[in-house]
Amino acid sequence: MLNIKWIRENQELFDEKLSQRFIEPMSSKIAMLDQEKRKITSLIQEFQHARKVKSKILGNMVSKSGEEFEELQRDVNHINEKLAELEQNLDNNNELNELLNMLPNIPDEEVPYGIDGSMNKLVRAYGKTNKNALNKQHFELGTKLNLMDFEQTAKISGSRFVTLKGDLAKLERALINFMIDIHTKEFDFFEISPPFLVRDRAMYNAGQLPKFSEESFITTNGYRLIPTAEVSLVNIVADTIIQREKLPMRYVAYTTCFRSEAGSSGRDTRGMIRLHQFGKVELVSITTPEESKNEHEYITNASETILKKLDLPYRVMLLCTGDMGFAAKKTYDIEVWLPGQNQYREIASCSNCGDFQARRMKARYKEFGSNETTLVHTLNASGLPIGRTIVAILENYQNNDGSITIPDVLINYMGGLQKITTYSE
């Protein structure tokens, strides 16, 4: 959520930043609603003070009868009626909060202006891309190996699901352990095993609700399946005040993630690129405003390191204003090279959300010995999605005979296996 005080004091700049996100000016409407809310709040405070004063006088009166007592009693009753009316008006006046809840984060000054992904900015690239036209796509390789099943899985669960078998299932498990080891041992992230089912409040805190309600799965009793472990991890600090010396707090978790892929009809209908259910290692950092810029580079480097150790070609893109996620103020996308598609595809998103999520979930920190609190900054990064990493390995490590060479760093995790070959049932 955006800072209403900042909007009040920077209306022209606020509208300019909204325009970069292709949203019409909102400052005038917000200022009007804010003024109404502040007026009601001020009246409530005045009546509460008056009630306190008169109630104290009533309590100190020796005689609990007589004209003066009855007049004061009527005044207190009248104040209670007015307070109830004003508080009801305040509860009903939700338009301001509803409007603020639908507005995305303000882009950082370093974010380039742009309409869509075609206007993102190249930051750096790693590795050499293989542009052999004979390269096969991952789903061709996986099904030919008899280790990737879409057809039978569709009978079980429908479209956008997959079953991995044998050495591909083993590769999935190896990647999870490999990624967690790197993030915990080399980057000092603390491993968490969080819940996959969360309440609406947790989704709201992370910026998933109310805007993206249709993109998540909801159970019959009101829980939602997490679209990313970011939701569970950032909420670890919801409604807390953290001592400054404990920051940064860095969390890593592997979870299954669930997405309805609403609005993705016709996109990536074949293969493992866009599934309803997928595994992902997620990174979350909680830090101070002063350190969040450096932490953004740190958490991005952690994601990049996985790809470097796997020797997968990739590039880092700074997203433009029109391509950023809702809660982010600045985002790097890491795109891995897929020779079967002859193009780069997103494999990780690394975002600095500033105090946007923290304001929603009231996550603050304070210096030792001080009572003054400040909102934390939250950051997140994919570290990485397991399915898309398997896709990248299959396409970049494919051999002419259809077998897949295991990346060197994964051989021990694969029990010494150096090559995946066709499975015969």
Curated annotation (Swiss-Prot):
Quote the Pfam families the UniProt record gives.
Answer: Seryl_tRNA_N (PF02403), tRNA-synt_2b (PF00587)
InterPro entries (UniProt xref) = aa-tRNA-synt_IIb, aa-tRNA-synth_II, aa-tRNA-synth_II/BPL/LPL, Ser-tRNA-ligase_type_1, Ser-tRNA-synth_1_N, SerRS_1_N_sf, SerRS_core, tRNA-bd_arm
Tell me the route in metabolism or biology where this protein functions: Aminoacyl-tRNA biosynthesis; selenocysteinyl-tRNA(Sec) biosynthesis; L-seryl-tRNA(Sec) from L-serine and tRNA(Sec): step 1/1
Keywords in alphabetical order: Aminoacyl-tRNA synthetase, ATP-binding, Cytoplasm, Ligase, Nucleotide-binding, Protein biosynthesis
Instruction: List ligand-binding residues for L-serine.
Output: 228-230, 282, 382
Q: What class of enzyme is it?
A: ligase
Is the keyword ATP-binding assigned to this protein?
yes
- SUPFAM superfamilies under this entry? Class II aaRS and biotin synthetases, tRNA-binding arm
* GO terms for MF: ATP binding; serine-tRNA ligase activity
What domain of life? Bacteria
Q: Provide the residue positions that the database annotates as binding ATP.
A: 259-261, 346-349
Please cite one Gene Ontology biological process associated with this protein: seryl-tRNA aminoacylation
Instruction: Give the catalysed reaction(s), semicolon-separated.
Output: tRNA(Ser) + L-serine + ATP = L-seryl-tRNA(Ser) + AMP + diphosphate + H(+); tRNA(Sec) + L-serine + ATP = L-seryl-tRNA(Sec) + AMP + diphosphate + H(+)
Q: In UniProt terms, what function does this protein have?
A: Catalyzes the attachment of serine to tRNA(Ser). Is also able to aminoacylate tRNA(Sec) with serine, to form the misacylated tRNA L-seryl-tRNA(Sec), which will be further converted into selenocysteinyl-tRNA(Sec).
What does the entry's free-text domain comment contain?
Answer: Consists of two distinct domains, a catalytic core and a N-terminal extension that is involved in tRNA binding.
Q: Which NCBIfam families does its entry note? A: serS
Quaternary structure note:
Homodimer. The tRNA molecule binds across the dimer.
* Family listed: Belongs to the class-II aminoacyl-tRNA synthetase family. Type-1 seryl-tRNA synthetase subfamily.
Protein name (database record): Serine--tRNA ligase
